[in-house]
UniProtKB/Swiss-Prot annotation:
Residues that hold substrate according to the record: 27-31, 77, 151, 203, 317
Localization per record: Cytoplasm
Record-given protein name: Uroporphyrinogen decarboxylase
One of the GO BP terms on file: protoporphyrinogen IX biosynthetic process
The organism's taxonomic lineage, starting at the top: Bacteria, Pseudomonadati, Pseudomonadota, Alphaproteobacteria, Rickettsiales
Gene Ontology terms: cellular component: cytosol
Main location per the UniProt record: cytoplasm
């Protein structure tokens, strides 16, 4: 899977810098690319795209081909787990995911069908890995259990999370446990099919108080990581508890993650002083989309801060759909040559 060159996977495993700072971007495959828009122009259902092996393979490789990214991330969605659990997941253009809200853990299916249901995605992982140059890592992923739970209880993305935060605690805990169980199986399968690195996206982590963050983010993440490391002892796992603020420190120290991706609100000097594992991040995607000059300037500041550490350049969240491809190309060229 890996060659003698220093891959992202090796930087994380060895916990040491790998020479040049590597780069990949969250949501690097997607609507910002004209070739993506062309490939999906006849597809109306986003979930159908996610279960189409050949299309997922093509979409995953597009940004690697165009920009020579140092990693590919499998084209998929964190709500695949919700779909596997029997939730009715639909993506509405301009709105995002809409799900029939779950009222009780009894409504969720068990993990029995997970491999059958996700086989098209797993086969895409296998296919991408066979086509990807050896020096480039393939990243598999899943949503953090808290984030997936918040979507299936709220029924859509939320700014307040009022419904999930007022949900019966015992029911919420059981839903998170069920999601955790299925996520473990799914991620182990991704590794078996060829993923070199796993990233856990806990996009809604910032909604929680410190005690709830420990219960709903740290504990399930720890359980997932222990299960993976039980099978694959030094496997590189990146955690992304977005908007966790000072709780990033607890997350790094208590979950067992191999590396952490930081959002663009995290002060880089604070991260360098407090987070003692390989770091990934954290350019503001708004800068990349709307102010190329400022984005390049900020990218240099980030690299200057982290270049003596095991560090992977990324954004602090996903690429925005209207980001000009020339801005992405300029960023990649800067990071690779700086």
């Amino acid at each position: 899977m890996e060659s003698g060159k220093t891959t992202i996977a090796k930087i994380i495993k060895r916990n040491e810098p790998g020479g040049r700072v590597p780069i990949w971007l969250m949501r690097q495959a997607g609507r910002s690319l004209p070739e993506y828009r062309k490939a999906v122009e006849n597809m109306n259902n986003f979930m159908e795209i996610c279960y189409n092996t050949d299309l997922v393979t093509e979409l995953t490789l597009q940004p690697v081909t165009r920009f020579d990214m140092d990693a590919a991330i499998i084209f998929s969605d964190i709500l695949i787990i919700a779909d596997v659990l029997g939730c009715d997941v639909n993506f509405v253009r301009g709105v995002g995911p809409i799900i029939k809200p779950v009222e009780s853990p009894k409504e969720l299916k068990g993990p029995q069908e997970i491999e059958t249901k996700t086989l098209p995605i797993l086969n895409a992982i296998k296919k991408v890995r066979s086509q990807l140059p050896k020096e480039k890592s393939l990243i598999g992923f899943a949503g953090g259990p808290w984030t997936v739970a918040s979507y299936i209880i709220e029924g859509r993305s939320s700014k307040t999370f009022s419904k999930v935060l007022n949900f019966y605690p015992s029911c919420l805990k059981e839903i998170i446990e069920r999601i955790t169980e299925v996520t473990i199986i799914y991620l182990i399968k991704q590794i078996e099919f060829g993923a070199d690195v796993i990233q856990l996206f806990d996009s809604n982590a910032g909604a929680l108080s410190e005690p709830l963050f420990k219960e709903y983010v740290i504990e399930p993440t720890k359980r997932i990581i222990l299960a993976i490391k039980d099978r694959f002892s030094d496997f590189p796992i990146i955690g992304f508890p977005r908007s966790a603020g000072n709780l990033y420190k607890d997350y790094c120290e208590q979950t067992g993650v191999s590396a952490v991706s930081i959002d663009y609100n995290v002060p880089i000097k604070w991260a360098k002083a407090n987070l003692n594992i390989p770091l990934q991040g954290n350019l503001d995607p708004n800068l990349l989309a709307y102010n190329k000059t400022e984005a390049i300037k900020e990218a240099k500041r980030i690299i200057d801060c982290f270049r003596d550490l095991p560090f992977i350049f990324n954004l602090g969240h996903g690429v925005l759909p209207d980001t000009p491809v020339e801005n992405i190309a300029a960023l990649v060229n800067l990071v690779k040559s700086y």
